[in-house]
């Protein structure tokens, strides 16, 4: 396989980034990152723009205490339902997402939070193909200031599309804008 377009959403953007960091882009033509997790989410001395580690510890504690309540809070912020429901996300769409989350492994629900803290900074310079990043300006899961807004300059050929008012799941709530950006980039 060659001439591939790699695309990822949320945690999947980390998978795409790590793949290119490890294996290079010889078989890849373009990259799409929707709701990007890179460069590095965790706040540290060498990453002051990151998110405080207590946020993630509190999330893991919430999963242990009552993962269904955690899923409700997470999905409310995934879609920004307080602002966008019912016009951009229906109760049925939210319930479908909840059903998927509830069917997940309890262990995976907890363990995946640590995977969000992977450091992709060394992988980013290896991305040497045209890259589209599409991110919601009101993303409460992966705040744009800690993620996508930091990518220009870290990836050589990057186009950043900021979806005004967009939550984390912009593919659902702002599909027209996301699809337009994708079609323009892939043309």
Where on the chain are the PLM-derived regions?
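Catalytic active-site module of serine/aspartate enzymes centered on a nucleophile-bearing elbow/loop
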Residues: 156-187
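Catalytic nucleophile serine of serine hydrolases
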Residues: 10-11, 35
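Acidic beta-to-alpha connecting loop that harbors the catalytic carboxylate
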Residues: 137-140, 165-167
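Conserved alpha/beta-hydrolase "acid-adjacent" motif
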Residues: 140-146
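Flexible "cap/lid" loop of the alpha/beta hydrolase fold
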Residues: 17-65
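Conserved alpha/beta-hydrolase catalytic His-Asp/Glu region
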Residues: 39-50, 61-125
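Short beta-strand/loop motif that positions the catalytic acidic residue
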Residues: 127, 133-135, 139
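Alpha/beta-hydrolase fold nucleophile elbow
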Residues: 1-10
